[in-house]
Amino acid sequence: MTGAVCPGSFDPVTNGHLDVIGRVAAQFDEVVVTVLINKSKRGMFTIDERIEMLEDATSHLPNVRVTSWHGLLVDYAKQEGLSAIVKGLRGANDFDYELQMAQMNQKLTGVDTLFVATNPTYSYLSSSLVKEVATFGGDVSDMLPAKVHSRLLARIAERAAENS
């Protein structure tokens, strides 16, 4: 059985993430989507909320499961017996950063990183950009699963109410 891990913060999951996850799921027997925990960053959504949104958005993919991890991703991949880390690349900036990470991960544990070119439809898309645009009232409904979009708008409204 071949398995891969697709890591990210997924705060929130976008249609670009889902495109990559779906394409990876077609290539591997098992795909573990892993929400990486970074305690130095305060996300818009909790880890549990992100996992819930990812589970809902990937429920049609029987070989995908969702987890979270705090620590070195390669340690998680080794622990779970996953043969590859798969990362979506939007452009050259992503590649420059991810290549160094891939080389370090390979050196540490021998786990390889595979890069998947993002569908051009989503090459501009990032969770950070979606949150920023939505916060200022921009329409991001076609960039997120419908349930995620609803939750994002609700969270933005909650934060606005807290700050007024």
Curated annotation (Swiss-Prot):
Reaction(s) catalysed by this chain's protein: (R)-4'-phosphopantetheine + ATP + H(+) = 3'-dephospho-CoA + diphosphate
Site feature Transition state stabilizer, where: 17
- Chief localization class? cytoplasm
Name of one Pfam family that matches: CTP_transf_like
Query: Which molecular function term from Gene Ontology is one that the record holds?
Result: pantetheine-phosphate adenylyltransferase activity
Q: Annotated pathway, please?
A: Cofactor biosynthesis; coenzyme A biosynthesis; CoA from (R)-pantothenate: step 4/5
The cofactors it requires, by name, are: Mg(2+)
Function per UniProt: Reversibly transfers an adenylyl group from ATP to 4'-phosphopantetheine, yielding dephospho-CoA (dPCoA) and pyrophosphate.
Summarize subunit and interaction data from the UniProt record for this chain: Homohexamer.
The family assignment reads: Belongs to the bacterial CoaD family.
- The molecule here is called Phosphopantetheine adenylyltransferase
